[in-house]
Amino acid sequence: MISDSMTVEEIRLHLGLALKEKDFVVDKTGVKTIEIIGASFVADEPFIFGALNDEYIQRELEWYKSKSLFVKDIPGETPKIWQQVASSKGEINSNYGWAIWSEDNYAQYDMCLAELGQNPDSRRGIMIYTRPSMQFDYNKDGMSDFMCTNTVQYLIRDKKINAVVNMRSNDVVFGFRNDYAWQKYVLDKLVSDLNAGDSTRQYKAGSIIWNVGSLHVYSRHFYLVDHWWNTGETHIVKKDYNGEWK
C-alpha cells in the first residue's frame, strides 16, 4: 500500500496558510520564503504553482541526456540561474543525467535496472544522485551548486513501479515542475526498459512520492500563492495580479 501522504492540492493549502500567517523564513541571501520542513506528498500533478514551460523542460531533458557538466551545453540560451551557480569554468554538479547514467557516478540507472530485473521485490532499487564529497564540491572554483536530489528509490508492487524521490531542497515554482518532469521521464523509461527485458512483466508506472527537507516558495512568487488562495487558480501573469504581493 502507498502511505496516506498529502496531495499537491494539500501542499498548496499548507503554503497558502503559511503566507496568510506571514510565517516567513529568511534564507542565506536575505530573501523571505515560506517553507514546509519535511514535506511528503504524492506528486499527483505536474506543478504546484505557476505553469509548465514545456520548451524549457525539453531543453533541460536534452542537456541531461548529454551528461554534460557544462551549462554552455544546455540547448538554446543558457538560463541565468545556471550561469549564476556555475563555476568560473561554467561547470556545475547537478546534471541529473550525468548523476544516473555516467560511469563516473557508478552507473546508477543501470545498477537499479539490473537489481529490479533480478529481484522485483527488492528494496535496493535505488539511484543515488549526490555523494559525500558534495560537502566540498558544491563551491569548487566559485560554484554554488549543492545537488538538491539525494536519492530516488523504485519499488515494484502489484505490477506497478513506484518512485520515492528524496530531496534536501526544492523550490516550489521553478524547481518542482522541472524536477517532476525529469522524474516522470526516468520512471517511464525504467518501466519500458524492464518490460523490454521480459515481455511477461507488463509493469506500469505507479505513484511518485515526493519527500523534501525544505519545500519552499521565494518571495518573488508569493503572488502566485496569494492568487491561488483567493481564486483557486494556480497561475496568473504577474502584471495581471493586483494583490498584496505585487
Swiss-Prot record:
Coiled coil residues, start to end: none
Enzyme Commission number(s) of this protein: 2.1.2.8
InterPro entries, alphabetized: Deoxycytidylate_hydroxyMease, Thymidate_synth/dCMP_Mease_dom, Thymidate_synth/dCMP_Mease_sf
A GO MF term: deoxycytidylate 5-hydroxymethyltransferase activity
Enzyme superclass (EC): transferase
Active site (UniProt): C148
Catalytic activity, as annotated: dCMP + (6R)-5,10-methylene-5,6,7,8-tetrahydrofolate + H2O = 5-hydroxymethyl-dCMP + (6S)-5,6,7,8-tetrahydrofolate
Keyword entries, A-Z: Transferase
Domain of life: Viruses
Pfam families the record matches: Thymidylat_synt
Family: Belongs to the thymidylate synthase family.
Name of the molecule in the record: Deoxycytidylate 5-hydroxymethyltransferase
Species: Enterobacteria phage T2
Lineage: Viruses, Duplodnaviria, Heunggongvirae, Uroviricota, Caudoviricetes
